[in-house]
Structures are given as structure tokens and as C-alpha cells.
Amino acid sequence: MDKTIYGQAFRFACTGVVNTLAGMAVMFGLYNIFGCSYWVSSAVNYTAISVLSYFLNRKITFGYSGKVLKSGIRFAVNIAICYLAAYGATKPLVMTVMADSPVKLRENAAMLAGMCIFTGLNFLGQRFFVFGEKKNMDYRKIYEKWVESPHLEESEKNVLAEMSEEEISDAFYRKLSFGTAGMRGVMGLGMNRMNRYTIRMAAKGFAGILGEGAKVAIAYDTRNHSDEFAKEAARVLAASGVKALLFDRYSPVPLLSFTVRDLKCDGGIVITASHNLPAYNGFKVYDCTGCQLGRESAAKISENIENLDDELGIPVSDEDDPNIEYIGQDVIDRFMDAVQKCGVDTAPEAASDLSVVYTPLHGSGREYVLETLRRAGFSNVTLVKEQADYNGDFPTVRKPNPEETAVFYIAEEKAKEIGADVIIGTDPDSDRIGAGVMHDGKIVYLSGNQTGALFVDFLARMRQSAGKKLITSIVTGDMGQDIAASYGVETIRTFTGFKDLAAEMNRHREDEILMAYEESYGYLTGTHIRDKDGISSSLVMCQMAAYWKQQGKTLIDVLEDLFAEHGYYIDDQLSFVFEGAAGADRIASIMKRFRSEGESVFADICELAELRDYSRGAEGVAEANVLKFMFSNGSWAAARPSGTEPKVKFYCCIKDRDREQAEKLHSLLKNRIEKEVEQA
């Protein structure tokens, strides 16, 4: 028998004490004081306290993280079987053994004996049936392997020893998955956590597809432990015969992508969790083109990780290994030169006349964005000093995400104070940019789709654009595409995620590309890298605002002009977060509901022209878990699980010549999605 049964039995007994005492009071009170029958007294008791017992044992005794509905049904079945077995069999037996005793004494004795038998059967049933799924029993074995490993330091073993059962379960019930976005998770000890051991596993898996003699560039952002994790990755690669080129300072994603191409590396690594909560970190991997890994390569790395003989004993080199080198300033200088080429020619007086407030949100973009704007002639730039320090706790925000307007509260105050024209902000790894515009005395924030549409219009206007290509994703709004068409620019759509946009770029000549962008605030206005770039996007944002200011317009004025020309667009995204194993099951259930109900989901709201199921390869896009509801008026809604966070995302793109009608349809779609998710 598994040795952990003793610990579980002890916790079961402890959580059961209160239930048992309360149950005895209810049962004997109903029987002896209120005169209820034997069966009524015992049934009321166990029905009431079983509900509490389920949640206590689920959380405390067994640390179970599976679906509530399934385990709840098993729990009810278990209670019924235990009750009938304990009390149905116990009463006749006690009545026979105590035949000469008074009836009341015999029935009290039968209830007491039944309770003892019920408790024992209930524990066994819960352990092996209710909460006994294999994945929830295996985590203990993995945990104990870590505790007993000679490769862990004593301080780490002490941390493991202090974990609660629930913490152990969540940290060890699965391995962090490795996909095309790499690996991302909460930092801490365990297979389901980001730590030096899981970093080593990922690095070893990557080394396995490269081979000896390969060359890999490694960057890291300002998140806690990012620099340590980067060095761990370098040590593993070096020990595997791979040359590791490491930055000696915080470096943004676009710089890493550029470096891979500039130094002709075989791949790249960035230690970052982008704009996730402070508790997270991640391991992003790039191919030789500076693009995030494709599905086939990611699958090979995942397979290599699964096949590791000793996950905790992966060989590492010393930090002074000759296979570890540091990247020089010359690479950074070439990157900064390349960023300038992503912009357009604007009058010097236009740049100096624009007032900009910039926040790096404690991330790696600070020096790069400031220097980029300085080189382009933007001399009136105010840095948000409260958010300028490198700090992985991101103390001034809940989440360092420039998609969320709440992070700009300090920047907005400064903008109003000095009368700034625009606010810009980059996330910790500086691949995304968010922006707000001073319009009629207040800051109006641009959505990712609106910024992309403005970029398309500006770049197409300022460059020779006819015949070029705009690359975007299947869940990005249509406004940019419609604007592009008016300039003779073709739009190519790929699966969501910039790796797919960048891979599409690789299929065309660089002079054929106008730009690439997606709705999640990621833009690439040049061809110097193969990932989104918050640094060059900051430059183009400021050049665009400066250009239109010279014409007497804000970017909001320009947006309204585009609405008047192309129609009114509302783009919205709804995200629903579901943590842990139970959350993953819930997300799967939601997608199943929308997929199975299909055409009926929005039938009473808007006529459905087509349901595109990308799991079947719709639009020629590689198979993906995405649904897109195409409506007859040109609007659409889409659903997909996030690839990097425990959430399911819904997208709405509504377009209509009548703004009021567009807003009405948006409200109806949003309410329907929320209702369907709640019921799934």
C-alpha cells in the first residue's frame, strides 16, 4: 500500500472530527429528542455533513485538483454505497448480537457501529475512487523523488518539506508543457513550476535538436530570476557542446531576434513571461531566422524533455566555460541602427514639437526606447520615473501589461500635468506597446486593432505600398485589412501568434512586406527581426502622432476619419481565467460547447454565414483549436484557448456604417458569450 495513505488517513481523521461531532449531535438529537426514526435521523445527518466533508477532503486530505462535477458525482455514489453497507448491514447484525437488550439501546449501538464502519469505508472509497485518479496519485512519487534527490540543495529540500498537500499537488501534478511559445509558469520548486531544474530540462531539450557546434544567443528581461535562469540555460548548452552567447544586461525580445540573425546563430532563447503576473517566468525559443520555433521543432524539444534519463541530474558547465561568451555593444549598436530604418522621414520640427510620456513598466525597454526616440529627434520625452527602475516585482502595477489601461495611471497624471500629446508604454520584454492619445483634454486609449489600423494607414500613405503585403492573424480585426485594400495592399492571415506571422514573412521577399501585426498589441513595422517589436513600434507611433499633429489632428481625429471612410468598427476581447487542472478541463468544456452547438449559439442575434472550425484546417491555416463565427453583415466572433495562460479568449469584430447598430450588436454578442461560458 502507498505509504502516503497514513498521512492521508491522519488528515482525513482530523477533518472528520468536526464533521463527526456535529453529525453525532444532529443524528442523536433528531432520534432521542425530536423522536425522528432511525433512518431519518441518520440520513439527515449524512446528507448535511457530506457536502462539507467533500470540500474539506478534496482540498485538505487529498489535494485533489480535478473537475468538481465528476468527483462530486463519484462522492455522492460513494456516500450512498458506504451508507447502505454500513447501516443496512450493521443494524441487523447488532439487533441479532444484542437480542436481549432494549430496542433503543440496540438501535443506538447500531448507529454507533455503523458510523465507525461508514468512516472506514468512506475513507477508502474517497482515496481510491472519488479522488483516486492516476494523475493525482503520481504527483507524490515525483515530489518524493525531488525530496530525495542528491542534486537538490538542502535549502530547496527544506522548502519542499514545508509545502502543504495542496501546494505539492499543484507543483507536481504535471510537467510544464513545452510548445511553440516555449515554456511558461509560476516560479517555484516542482515540475509544474519555473525553476533552475525545469530551465535545465528545456535547455537540454533544445540542445538535443541543435547538436554540438551550434551557436545560440540568450537574452533575459527584468523578471525575478531571469538572469539566473539565463545563466543556467547557458551552462547546459555549453556542457552539451553548444556555444552560448549571453547578454550581460537586461535585453528585450526584439534585440534577441535581431542578434540571432545578425550573428547567424542557430537559435535563440529569451527568459521572459512577457506581460504575465510577477509570479511568472518563461523560456522562449527561437530558430535560426529569429522566429519563434515552429510546431515540429517544439514537438521534438518536448519529446527530448520527456526522454531525459535523469531530469534533476542534467550536466552543467562552469560559468567560465569557453563555450559561454558575452555579446558585445557592437551588436546592440547595429540593432539600434536597424530600428531607425523601421520609421519614416518626418520633419525635424514635427518630432521636437511632440510631447511624449513613456513608461517601461519596470521592464527592459527603458534605454532602448529612449535612445531610439532621441536619435529620431524626439527631444520632448518624459520618462515615468516611478516605473523606470528594473524591478521584477512590478510594484506599481498588478500586472505589467500595456494592453490594460490601468497601468498608465501615473503616466496619465503626468501627461495631463505637462499637456503631453501621447502616452506610450512597453511590457517587460518590450515586444508590445500600448498607447494613449490626448484628445479634447483627456487621454483616449487605443486598442491593439486601432493602433494596427492607424499604422497600416500611416505606413501605406508614407511608403510606396501598392502590391505589398500586410500579414495579420485570423483573430485580428478587419479594419486594418480594409484600409490596406484601399491602398492596393494584400492581406495574408495566419494562425494567431507572431511566430506564424513571422514564418509567413519568411515566405516573401523583404521588400514585399508592408508590416505585420496582431490585435494583442504586437507590431512589426520593419523586416530587421522576426518577432513583434515594441521599440520600433514606439518610434512609428511617435512619428505618426507628430505627422498628424502638423496637420492639426490627433490620432483620434484620424481614427474618426477612417471610420467615416471605411465604416465603424468595434473590436473587443473577452478573457475567462480558469486555473489548474480543473481549469484546463473547464476550458475544454467551453470550447466543446461552442463547437457542438455551432450554428445555434448566436442564431437569434445575427445571421450566421459560416462557421469556421480551424481544428479542421479552415482557410488553409494549420490545424488549431479556434472557432470563428462569420456573420452575414461582415462581423464575426471567435473563440480559442490561450497558448500561454490558463484562459479562454473570445474575440468580436463588429462593423457597420451605423455606429449605434454596431454598438447594439456588440452588446448582444458580449452578453451571449458571457452567458454561454457561465453555462458550459
Say what each PLM segment does.
Residues 167-172, 176, 281-407, 415:
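Gly/Ser/Thr-enriched, mixed-charge loops and adjacent short helices
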